[in-house]
Regions:
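Buried hydrophobic packing residues in well-ordered domains
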Residues: 15, 41, 58, 82, ...
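Envelope-exposed proteins and targeting segments
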Residues: 21-23, 37-39, 63, 139-142
Length: 162
């Protein structure tokens, strides 16, 4: 949430508002998994801008969170977003059951669900910095670039009966 999720996040502020090189930017990961999983970043490069420049800017923000802990405001905003999402995720008996079932399935145990808010509130700026340094390390990255192809023109063909 500090790097992504919202217009006040570091990536959005940097790439969309300040540098104006991206139309959208963010990050996400799967929280409910037993083993290490995918944490990914994405950006929609503004027409006319270089993909490499946007990638470099994303990497600079990753490096920044590894070397500069989030401010208290950033940390509290992230905690509020995470807590609200967790509460809204349980807005029905079905969703509560799914969440408890997922926790059991991955071996975390259903009790972890009830401890989630408390554990989130206990996270410190140094915890965020330490996790970013460990999990977002340069030697653990894979980069992919999706480049749209120009539309192909089709020769006019007579209508085919069905």
């Amino acid at each position: 949430s500090i790097l992504s999720h919202g217009k006040s996040a570091r990536l959005y502020q940097s790439l969309v508002y300040e540098q104006k090189t991206a139309l959208a930017v963010g990050a996400d990961y799967g929280l409910m998994q037993a083993d290490p999983g995918l944490f990914y970043f994405y950006a929609v490069v503004k027409p006319g801008e270089k993909v490499e420049a946007v990638e470099d800017a994303v990497l600079k923000e990753i490096q920044r969170i590894q070397t500069e802990p989030p401010s208290e405001l950033e940390l509290q905003r992230a905690k509020n977003q995470i807590e609200a999402a967790h509460i809204f995720e349980q807005d029905s008996n079905f969703r509560q059951a799914m969440l408890l079932g997922e926790a059991e399935t991955i071996g975390a145990g259903w009790r972890k669900v009830s401890q989630f808010v408390e554990r989130t509130r206990a996270v410190t700026a140094q915890d965020v910095q330490r996790a970013a340094s460990h999990y977002l390390a340069a030697d653990m990255r894979t980069t992919g670039t999706l480049i749209p192809q120009p539309p192909q023109t089709q020769a006019a063909s007579p209508a085919q009966p069905h």
